């Protein structure tokens, strides 16, 4: 996992430091949180249980930034209900003209899945490609994650 991050960053392909914003959502990996952008941030979505304790000590309690914890197993997918919760959290903060940082440990699979869903909900026709081109070609790592993005967006289109 960390080898993939180093490989991507060293070759200039990934932007795990929060510099990319996809419709108000900034992806960041564990070691690269965009602390320099704190004035723009309205909330954080943390997709990994390992973050919980340390994150509370660093950001959530002292800085009072709303944080949504949705623990998803590494290389896994959220439930539909969890994705709905994530989307609602993002919509709320973006509607207040704030951005949301989404992060897991590596910043590829789980983070990429959320980014692709968000891009699709914002009208992008090929959201997985879009996220891979703008953020990281390693985003949305597994077939299961790709299928989740496609099926979730189909379900939301049907209403």
From Swiss-Prot:
InterPro entries xref list: Prot-tyrosine_phosphatase-like, PTP, Tyr_Pase_dom
Pfam families found in the cross-reference section: Tc-R-P (PF22785)
Molecular function as annotated in GO: protein tyrosine phosphatase activity
GO cellular component: cytoplasm
Gene3D superfamilies reported in the protein's UniProt record: Protein tyrosine phosphatase superfamily
Highest taxon of the lineage: Archaea
Family: To M.jannaschii MJECL20.
Designated name of the protein: Uncharacterized protein MJ0215
Organism: Methanocaldococcus jannaschii (strain ATCC 43067 / DSM 2661 / JAL-1 / JCM 10045 / NBRC 100440)
């Amino acid at each position: 996992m960390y080898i993939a991050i180093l490989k991507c960053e060293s070759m200039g392909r990934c932007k795990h430091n929060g510099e990319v914003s996809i419709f108000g959502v900034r992806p960041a990996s564990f070691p690269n949180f965009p602390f320099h952008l704190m004035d723009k941030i309205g909330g954080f979505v943390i997709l990994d249980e390992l973050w919980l304790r340390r994150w509370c000590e660093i950001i959530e309690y002292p800085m009072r930034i709303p944080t949504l914890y949705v623990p998803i197993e590494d290389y896994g997918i959220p439930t539909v209900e969890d994705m709905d919760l994530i989307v609602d959290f993002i919509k709320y903060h973006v509607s207040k003209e704030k951005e949301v940082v989404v992060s897991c440990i590596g910043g590829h699979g789980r983070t990429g899945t959320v980014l692709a869903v968000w891009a699709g909900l914002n009208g992008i026709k090929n959201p997985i490609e879009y996220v891979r081109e703008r953020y990281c070609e390693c985003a949305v790592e597994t077939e299961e994650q790709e299928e989740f993005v496609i099926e979730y967006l189909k379900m939301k289109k049907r209403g």
